[in-house]
Design a protein with these regions (language model features):
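A short, basic/flexible loop-to-alpha-helix module at the beginning of a structural domain
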Residues: 1-8, 38
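NAD(P)-binding Rossmann-fold cofactor-contacting core
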Residues: 37-59
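Short acidic low-complexity segments
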Residues: 66-79
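Rossmann-fold NAD(P)-binding glycine/threonine-rich loop
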Residues: 93-163
Length: 452
């Protein structure tokens, strides 16, 4: 990498999971639109065909970036300036178990990738993979900045740091962005003032997918009273800011978010599908309850069908049968890369180990707060303490992250079972909990062969 005038050129980005059908395209688009960056993206994926398709798609953009599919992770990582990771840990067969096996025991999960039984088993598969990633990064590109998009986010980032303490890594999630956008819509509706998400200040703190906003303002306007009026207006029927909540598995009417504000006095800053999984079974008692709160259980069968559609789309684009235009994705990975290269500072929310940015959470717990991005540095901004009422909800999950990591490293079934039973949505007897745990262990046995 070198600088020419106000540009960073000859950059090398290693993309682990470079066959991605969605995240890779977003990165391609944002890189193509950023004129101050130039280089090569090395695409590595165990699904070689998908990586080759992305190579063809990326190179069709005719941008200042080249894309190269490589067959070894070592070649991708060697001397990389940045590493991007977005993988599916396991297959949809394992995900089917993660999400749907617990339903036989009355446990419903709207996502199943971060918490609950699904989040646990996804983590048990993911952590060993990330141990290997961290060791290879240490060997081949120890000074690279690592951007993680994979879930469970907090445990992925924790594993990277526990394995390679000097790693320069952070996790990115767009859930907070949607809540910030919702606040701007509240400001427009209640006060007639239009602004963009980036124009408002929000103090963000928590853990990934269970983040909270404790302060928010636009210029001199305190946005909490505005949001309170907005919630009061819409808390019965909801507010569908992304279209009819029934039109997409990813839409909601924000009723969970509004209910949490009513109960706890702070703004829950994630989508309802994620927020519901972190609380006791108020919102996930059964499918009928989910419908009442106007969000969705996302079936894995839909994900399988959607993946097939995305693969076909990739093939059409690669053959030139369908056009692929670069459009701004709304993600911040490229903005973060620019800032780390010294091309303009940035403040945004990211997931990194706690170094004191949250006062009442143990050090090294991976937390999500605002951080300052500047040349070769990510500096967490002090966010204060998690409010006591909110911490009562968050506490079991913070403890579970520590237990799950330890269970995965030690390959300890008893500790993993204990973590599952500790989850607030797992309201089972020990006997039934162990039956579910053993069934899910069998379903993901290929990844947990030498556990005891």
């Amino acid at each position: 990498m070198r600088y020419v005038d106000d540009k960073a050129v000859d950059l090398k980005i290693a993309y682990i999971g470079g066959g991605s059908k969605e995240w890779a395209r977003k990165l391609m688009s944002d890189l193509a639109l950023e004129e101050s960056l130039e280089g090569t993206v090395y695409l590595y994926d165990i699904d070689v065909e998908s990586a080759r398709l992305n190579e063809a798609i990326g190179n069709k953009l005719n941008s200042q970036w080249k894309y190269k599919c490589v067959l070894s992770i070592e070649e991708a990582l060697k001397d990389a300036d940045f590493v991007v990771i977005s993988i599916l840990p396991g297959t949809f067969n394992e995900m089917m178990s993660d999400v749907h096996a617990p339903e036989k025991y009355g446990i419903y999960q709207s996502v199943g990738d971060t918490t609950g039984p699904g989040g646990l088993f996804r983590a048990l598969r993911t952590i060993p993979i990330y141990v290997d990633f961290a060791n290879k990064i240490k060997e081949y590109c120890p000074n690279a900045w690592v951007i993680n998009y994979t879930n469970p986010m907090a445990l992925c980032v924790r594993t990277l740091y526990e394995t390679f303490p000097d790693i320069k890594a952070f996790g990115c999630c767009h859930e907070v962005f949607s809540t910030q956008s919702l606040i701007t819509k509240a400001l427009k509706e209640m006060e007639g003032i239009e602004c963009k998400r980036d124009d408002i200040y929000t103090n963000v703190l928590g853990i990934n997918h269970f983040t909270w906003i404790t302060k928010a303002h636009y210029k001199e306007i305190d946005l909490f009273p505005v949001y309170m009026k907005f919630v009061e207006k819409h808390k019965d029927d909801g507010y569908e800011d992304r279209g009819d909540w029934q039109d997409s598995y990813f839409n909601s009417a924000n009723l969970v978010k509004f209910d949490l504000f009513d109960k706890y006095g702070f703004i829950a800053a994630a989508g309802d599908r994620h927020l519901a999984e972190f609380t006791p079974k108020d919102y996930l008692k059964d499918p009928e309850t989910v419908g009442k709160w106007k969000f969705h259980l996302t079936p894995v069968s839909w994900r399988i069908k959607n993946r097939e559609s995305l693969i076909e789309k990739s093939r059409r684009i690669a053959k030139g049968e369908e056009e692929f235009k670069a459009v701004t994705s709304g993600e911040e990975g490229v903005k973060q890369i620019k800032a780390l290269l010294g091309l303009g500072d940035l403040i945004t929310n990211v997931n990194i180990p706690n170094r004191g940015q949250i006062g009442n959470v143990d050090f090294n717990t991976v937390v999500e707060t605002n951080s300052l991005f500047t040349k070769d540095g990510v500096y967490p901004i002090f966010a204060g303490n998690i409010p006591d009422r909110v911490k009562l909800l968050m506490g079991p999950h913070i403890l579970n992250q520590k237990m799950i990591f330890e269970a995965a490293v030690k390959k300890d079934k008893d500790l993993a079972l204990q973590a599952m039973l500790n989850d607030p949505i797992v309201n089972l007897t020990y006997e039934d909990g162990k039956k579910l745990f053993d069934e899910m262990m069998d379903n993901t046995r290929e990844y947990l062969k030498d556990w005891h």
